[in-house]
């Protein structure tokens, strides 16, 4: 019988209790699982210090957490001692003024129809501010509007080949009134000191932007870069700085 028992153990490949048989019975742990009903609720936190390089804009309704809406205020920097090349410009006016908001990612519906508006600030933002900042204190809704734009997170008017390229960045583009660019060029010519650095530019030329969601529940854009472009016409010049004329034909 002892030989038979030994043969049975040699053929048993069950390892579930391997090692446990060598432990004292007092060291065995009995494991069981169960479930409990719990109740949760969301509590609105107080204001926190706002320090981020991402601007969120859009609206979203969550079945569990409710309605969420976001816009952002931002300032624009200019390069030190920025100056338009008046010597080669074809006139002292702008050809085009545009504002471009770039984003790498978004949350929600990619094709949801949305609209946003951009307002110029009439007050310089504080150096330090918290999330309970009231945008209404920094712009005039009646006179500060500089552009509105309908959009979706994925722009199907742009071909797949371009959107899928490695150097493509998603964006929302506003074409601004030409007078916006004309005024900035004029100010640059008359007061170059206003463009000496970013602080002078913000204080004297352009205090900043408020980007506000108008409609389109279901999409939040994560804006990570804002460009203000003033485009102008200029003359072609040779190596001596002489203007070149277009040849006939």
Identify the meaning behind each predicted range.
Residues 1-249:
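Secreted, disulfide-rich extracellular signaling modules
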């Amino acid at each position: 019988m002892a030989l038979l028992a030994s043969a049975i153990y040699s053929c048993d490949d069950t390892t579930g209790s391997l090692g446990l048989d060598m432990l004292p019975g007092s060291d065995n742990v009995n494991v069981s699982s169960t479930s409990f009903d719990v109740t949760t609720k969301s509590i609105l936190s107080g204001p926190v210090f706002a320090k981020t390089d991402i601007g969120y804009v859009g609206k979203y309704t969550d079945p569990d957490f409710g309605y969420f809406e976001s816009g952002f205020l931002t300032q624009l920097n200019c390069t030190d001692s920025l100056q338009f090349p008046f010597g080669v410009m074809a006139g002292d006016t702008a050809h085009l003024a545009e504002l471009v908001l770039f984003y790498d990612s978004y949350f929600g519906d990619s094709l949801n129809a949305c609209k946003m508006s951009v307002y110029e600030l009439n007050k310089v933002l504080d150096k330090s501010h918290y999330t309970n900042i009231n945008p209404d204190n920094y712009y005039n809704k009646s006179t500060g509007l500089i552009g509105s734009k309908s959009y979706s997170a994925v722009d199907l008017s742009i071909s797949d080949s371009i959107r899928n390229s490695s150097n493509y960045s998603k964006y929302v583009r506003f074409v601004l009134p030409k007078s916006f660019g004309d005024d900035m060029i004029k100010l640059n010519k008359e007061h170059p000191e206003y463009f000496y650095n970013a602080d002078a530019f913000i204080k004297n030329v352009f205090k900043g932007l408020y980007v506000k969601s108008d409609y389109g529940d279901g999409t939040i854009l994560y804006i990570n870069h804002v460009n203000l472009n003033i485009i102008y016409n200029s003359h072609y010049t040779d190596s001596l700085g002489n203007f070149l004329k277009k040849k006939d034909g």
